[in-house]
From Swiss-Prot:
Produces ATP from ADP in the presence of a proton gradient across the membrane. The gene is atpC. This is ATP synthase epsilon chain. Keywords: ATP synthesis, Cell inner membrane, Cell membrane, CF(1), Hydrogen ion transport, Ion transport, Membrane, Transport. The lineage of its organism: Bacteria, Pseudomonadati, Pseudomonadota, Gammaproteobacteria, Enterobacterales. Belongs to the ATPase epsilon chain family. The keyword Membrane applies. The keyword tRNA processing does not apply. It is a peripheral membrane protein. Gene3D superfamilies: ATP synthase delta/epsilon subunit, C-terminal domain, F0F1 ATP synthase delta/epsilon subunit, N-terminal. F-type ATPases have 2 components, CF(1) - the catalytic core - and CF(0) - the membrane proton channel. CF(1) has five subunits: alpha(3), beta(3), gamma(1), delta(1), epsilon(1). CF(0) has three main subunits: a, b and c. NCBIfam families: ATP_synt_epsi, PRK00571.1-4.
Amino acid sequence: MAAKIYHLDVVSAEKQMFSGLVEKIQVTGSEGELGIFPGHAPLLTAIKPGMVRIVKEHGNEEYIYLSGGVLEVQPSTVTVLADTAIRGEDLDEARAMESKRKAEEHINNSHGDIDYAQASAELSKALAKLRVIELTKKAM
């Protein structure tokens, strides 16, 4: 019988955010949404700004915002190396809303492809933070 759990480490440049046994995770890779279950094939991929949804050993869920990074899947261990990682409960909703508003304003007033691309990336990050906040509130 295959294992129903595996070890997950979520690490940012500042600190280790999570280390423990999990049933599965969900993360946004460079090619789209990924669900990583026990026994997943080895994989190395870039992570887009978004969240990692962690389903812990006994079914409890945790959400962590990621600004991007790398996902490595090995037979019994999964590692998320994030540029920036923030727990859902540590995100500031008012700041995320203000970032969203500013990014939308920059998109509407952009002059050139570079301005638009930068504002679009900032909007994606703000929306991801707001989604993590929303899911964290539901899980509590």
